[in-house]
Amino acid sequence: ALPISLKQVDQDYIRILERTKQQITEFHKNQIDKSWSLYKDNGVIMGQMVRPIERVALYVPGGTAAYPSTVLMNAIPAKLAGVKDLVIITPVKADGKVNPVIVAAAKVSGVDTIYKFGGAQGVAAIANGTETIEKVDKIVGPGNIFVATAKKLSYGVVDIDMVAGPSEIGRASCRER
């Protein structure tokens, strides 16, 4: 069980999370692959077997801001695809707790466990496993340059989604003369 009751978070916010979950689910349910096979007269069997990834970690940046959208947009498709054990790794706030907004999004999304650690060291721990942390099969989610580098270095030990990091936004304008 996750370490928070949804009663600890504003109920209007919970309704927003639930509505967002419905919208994300509606979109992603159309992307679910299914196993199939063809049996030919000559005895040949052709097809595709689709099996979900067993255990996936979702990195959720924590630092100074909360990113519940990262939870929703990664956890809901994973659960729809059949991921059996979905865990979050995220840095804690200064008080040693995970932001309640992140925990609420995790509960709404069906996340199984939240680990209270992050950074490159968190990626290394979840990729390789420790005495107390079971390794995962895949790591997804954005992070800073250190997290992105740790994911890149972990590729091959575990699968990763991509080397995702901070977004850069620029604006260009031209003045006619």
What are these regions (language model features)?
Residues L38-A104:
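Conserved small-residue-rich beta-alpha loop and adjacent elements
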Residues P100-I114:
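Active-site-proximal helix-loop elements at catalytic-domain edges
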Residues L2, E176-R177:
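Short, small-residue-biased leader/transition segments that mark boundaries at the very start
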Residues A1-E54:
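N-terminal Rossmann-like NAD(P)+-binding subdomain of aldehyde/semialdehyde dehydrogenases
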Residues G110-R175:
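Conserved NAD(P)+-binding/catalytic subdomain of aldehyde/semialdehyde dehydrogenases
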Residues T20-K34, Y59, P77, A81, ...:
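Mid-sequence acidic-hydrophobic segments that form the walls
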Residues L6, D10-I24, M49, T64, ...:
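Generic structural signal for well-ordered, non-membrane alpha-helical segments
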